[in-house]
Amino acid sequence: MKSRMPSWVCKKGRVLIVSFAASFLLALSLAALWLWQSSAADVYLGISRAEGQKINMATVGFSNKVAGLQGENLNGLALKTLRSDMDLSAVISMVDPNSLPFDSTLVRPGREMEFLPRLSSLSIQVMLAAELSRSENKLILDAKLFDVSARQQILHNRYMADMKGLTAAVHRLSDDIIYYLTGERGICRTKLAFVSNKSGAKEIYLMDLDGDNVMQMTRNRSLNLTPRWSPDGRFLAYVSYRDGNPDLYLLDVTCGRRTKISSLPGLNISPAWSPDGKWMALALSKSGNTNLYLMRPDGGELRQITDGKAIFVSPTWSPNGRQIAFVSDQGGTPQIYVMDAEGTNMRRLTFQGNYNTSPAWSPKGDKIAFVSQQNGSLHIFAIRPDGGGLLALTHGAGQNESPSWSPDGRYIAFSSTRQGRSGIYIMREDGSGQRRLSSDDADYYTPDWSPR
């Protein structure tokens, strides 16, 4: 059965992949980001590493043919973005250029192989050489990857972007490097949807994982809440008070068009997409009590899956779509429960603490992150779906809320007031490596991580 989407959906943009021998003139005629690939292999298996060991990558060249101060800024931006992406990958480590036995900026196109022997004794497995150039109003990022030990070129890609699209090109390069060397799909091109009061009202925004390229998605000067990505990354479901009632909307991020999909009397909140995108779980109070329902993304086929006088909110699906975790106060305090997707076999999951909310099921299926109140502060915990393995992920000052998993299940985005204003942070699944993404004085809330 096909997913039922609104009939008004916009035409989806495409990223084209063509051969390295494709016409350069044809490439220049297109406005989107393009990629030429010279390598026929999908994954390179020549780099071996022990489990947990990172691949060391030297970065050389990044010579710049874009003249003037703008060119210098672009060069620095490309390196900064690449470094952030490789750090996020947790499998590739960029070697400090100052530690190399030669000036990395002097490596010129066509002469890269000459420098490989000088890296062999430095525990460096791969070398990335890159060059930025400009053709009319387009930027071209030419990147080559070399196996240091085998002394051979293993990848050659070119990326074209408009003058404001360099970071998107670098994110694409980063994902290609990660996939080519490890066989694992990268997350560098994913985004976070979130709520912020940057404009004075709480609106929906998007941003890259390095905190850059912030884009405002709603402009209704009202209260907008809980953006949730569709599994294909095409839509955002969110709650808005733009018409006075908490109604549920669907936003096509490819063109900005929105439609109201649930506006029943009372609450229309807590949207959660099924993994296949065919259903949406949500909380409604149309009958007085707040219960969980399923409906199609176009607002049709409404089905009630909980029935009680208690509150049922905040659903999250298991990655196989068979179960739903949610919050209910049916035991007297807000706790996490799990049930089958049709509403049967309900069981309580959390027993420690009197306030446990905001469950988020890992894409790997092995953990559920949630928020628990401990000694007056809100912290993020993780627990197995069977109720075991409880682990505190955040500690110290501040209120830590709204966990959202990365699509590979290795990171969690969340909001925290640890530095005063509410900001967006990410951390590894075990709670390590916590870092702030938002950088201004506005408040940031309820991040939701896009699919790949």
Each PLM stretch: what is its role?
Residues 186-188, 231-232, 275-276, 319-320, ...:
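Residue-level detector of Asp-centered blade-edge/turn motifs that repeat once per structural unit
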Residues 42-43, 109-176:
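Amphipathic beta-strand/beta-sheet edge segments enriched in Tyr/Trp
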Residues 149, 208-212, 252-256, 296-300, ...:
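Short loop/turn segments that connect beta-strands within beta-propeller blades
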